[in-house]
Amino acid sequence: MITGIKQMKNSILKIKNADGGIGTGFYCLIEPNNWNSFPLRVVMTNNHVLDENNIKIGKKIIYSLNNNKINKQIIIDESRITYTSKKYDITIIEIKE
């Protein structure tokens, strides 16, 4: 059980968008199923943290893991899977690194 709690804690991210806005999100691993044959790693957050303007091609997103000990960046390009919905207040971005 402690392992599960540690894994959950390590999945929480701090996200900074190109406009300087800051929010939180989660690192998620989507397991293979009928429609994809490989695990898909994504950042999932709210649309009010990263909206359609923040996930346009060329935009940069910085996220921090492990209480800001590890910083990574995503530069949005055509090869990434992205999804956002204002109605459902969700944004998903594929991680390739």
Regions found by a protein language model. Give the residues of each.
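Small beta-barrel nucleic-acid-binding modules, principally OB-folds
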Residues: 1-14
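Structural signature of eukaryotic scaffold interfaces centered on beta-propeller domains
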Residues: 32-35
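Serine endopeptidase catalytic core focused on the charge-relay Asp
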Residues: 9, 16-22, 37-40, 44, ...
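Generic, ordered loop/turn and secondary-structure boundary motif
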Residues: 28, 50-51
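Short beta-strand scaffold segments in enzyme catalytic cores
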Residues: 23-27
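Short beta-strand micro-motifs enriched in acidic
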Residues: 28-30, 84
